[in-house]
A protein has these predicted regions:
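Short, amphipathic alpha-helical interaction segments positioned at domain boundaries
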Residues: 76-82
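Short alpha-helical segments that sit at the start of domains
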Residues: 1-23
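Short acidic, hydrophobic short linear motifs in intrinsically disordered regions
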Residues: 29-41
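Short amphipathic alpha-helical interaction segments
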Residues: 44-57
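A short, conserved structural fragment
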Residues: 57-68
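Short glycine/proline-centered loop/turn elements that form peptide/ligand docking sites
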Residues: 11-14, 31-34, 48-51
Length: 82
């Protein structure tokens, strides 16, 4: 689960639709994921997913690796389901 309190202020003050899409993209990146896989899962174009992923990566929210992108661990909070 994403810890929204640790996200940058600019993301939290982004207009509603754009913010919702960015949160959805971040949720896809909780596990290693490529831009193409995230775009298919969210039913958006690869270019739109690339554009938002680029913004999120440039501000330091994502790690990049051979399997795609992943949300940095400090932005993920553990949820106890007991």
């Amino acid at each position: 689960m994403i810890d929204k309190r640790k996200l940058p202020l600019w993301l939290r003050t982004t207009p509603g639709r754009e913010r919702g899409l960015m949160y959805s993209i971040l949720q896809e990146y909780e596990q290693w994921c490529t831009i193409e896989m995230a775009a298919v899962m969210l039913n958006i174009t690869n270019y739109l997913c690339y554009d938002f992923t680029k913004k999120l990566f440039e501000c330091g929210l994502l790690d990049i690796g051979p399997d795609g992108y992943k949300l940095k661990p400090e932005y993920i909070k553990e949820v106890d389901h007991e």
